[in-house]
Design a protein with these regions (language model features):
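Rhodanese-like catalytic fold shared by cysteine-dependent sulfurtransferases
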Residues: 1-18, 25-58, 64-103
């Protein structure tokens, strides 16, 4: 399964999964899910920034609703990342379910 639900995120974090926000810096600064990284999917340096990450670690990617992050997940898998999952519904669903954000 390549997606996880909002309710599952904390369990994955406890197992040392890292969180990558693929939204713009402005979106990130307006509130995020305590992300470990913020790499704008639309940035021309997105793939270059991904190459700086360890392909052996586990990552959960998210965006506003899941579109950008699903594309980012596909790219990461193409680049050889072993474990990548997409947060279903992105930060929009996260907020709708009442989970906290960091500003």
């Amino acid at each position: 399964m390549d997606t996880i639900k909002s309710e599952e995120l904390e369990c994955f974090r406890k197992d040392k999964w890292l969180v990558l926000d693929t939204r713009t810096k402005e979106e990130y600064n307006s509130g995020n899910i305590n992300a470990d990284y913020n790499f704008d999917y639309y940035s021309p340096t997105f793939a270059e920034k991904l190459s700086e990450l360890s392909k052996e670690k586990n990552y959960i990617v998210y965006c506003k609703s899941g579109g950008r992050s699903s594309k980012a997940m596909s790219l990461m898998k193409e680049l050889g990342f072993k474990n990548v999952k997409n947060l279903e519904g992105g930060i929009t669903t996260w907020i709708e379910k009442g989970f906290p954000i960091t500003k």
